[in-house]
A protein has these predicted regions:
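Short beta->alpha transition motifs characteristic of CBS
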Residues: 35-45
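A short, polar/charged loop-to-alpha-helix boundary motif
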Residues: 43-61
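Immediate flanking context of iron-sulfur cluster ligation sites
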Residues: 76-86
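Local cysteine-cluster metal-coordination motifs and their immediate loop/turn environment
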Residues: 84-102
């Protein structure tokens, strides 16, 4: 598939955020040929290192925002695709509309903040309707949900957040919370394992 490389990079960025101890979400913008032209990752709990166009250490330092911020305003992007590992929130949906992108694909579901069903009813949005596709019904979607839930568990997310995930995506929640999951991801984090190794290891949790 022409987006396979873009999806791999998106998962790689999410895994980088997981290793850095922050919200594990990755996002890229792909051109009509599937080439990555912009990228970003979640940096909410990382200190700002001065990287141009990349928000960090604030509530809005989302992967999609950091990817879309790389697009120059000198053209429109109706023929480009925004790919993200997790169902985007309402802020990131609004940013996608502002960017002129009209196609958004997401890998994993977010039952708490995900806003894929939200429809922006403005003249601007009607001019360039945003078509949203997801989740992915394969190992990529499973991995995206798994590392997000594992991160929520590790970093003590509020009970309403955890309950929303347990109700909304119970299979992914059970796999992320089963015995051995925490130690597995601690080991991968300690080894600074590459994303392909992490996906392979995570498959042991998702195969049951």
């Amino acid at each position: 598939m022409f987006l396979d490389g873009a999806w791999h990079r998106t998962l790689e960025l999410a895994w980088q955020s997981f290793l850095a101890g922050t919200t594990p979400v990755g996002a890229v913008v792909a051109d009509p040929a599937g080439r990555v032209v912009a990228e970003g990752r979640g940096r909410r709990y990382e200190q700002d290192d001065g990287t141009r166009g990349q928000l960090a250490y604030c509530h809005i330092a989302h992967a999609e925002i950091n990817a879309l911020a790389q697009l120059p305003p000198t053209r429109h992007y109706e023929d480009h695709i925004l790919l993200t590992t997790l169902e985007p929130c309402c802020m990131c949906l609004g940013a996608a509309v502002q960017s002129t992108i009209t196609s958004l694909h997401f890998a994993g579901r977010d039952p708490y903040a995900g806003a894929a069903l939200l429809r922006v009813e403005t003249a601007q949005a009607r001019r360039r309707p945003l078509v949203i596709t997801g989740p992915l019904a394969d190992s990529r979607g499973q991995f995206a949900e798994l590392i997000h839930i594992r991160w929520l568990l590790d970093y003590g997310a509020a009970q309403p957040v955890l309950e929303a995930h347990e109700r909304g995506i119970p299979e992914s929640y059970e796999r992320a919370d089963r015995p051995g999951a925490s130690s597995l991801f601690d080991q991968l984090r300690g080894e600074v394992a590459p994303v392909d190794a992490a996906i392979t290891a995570a498959a042991e949790l998702t195969s049951g």
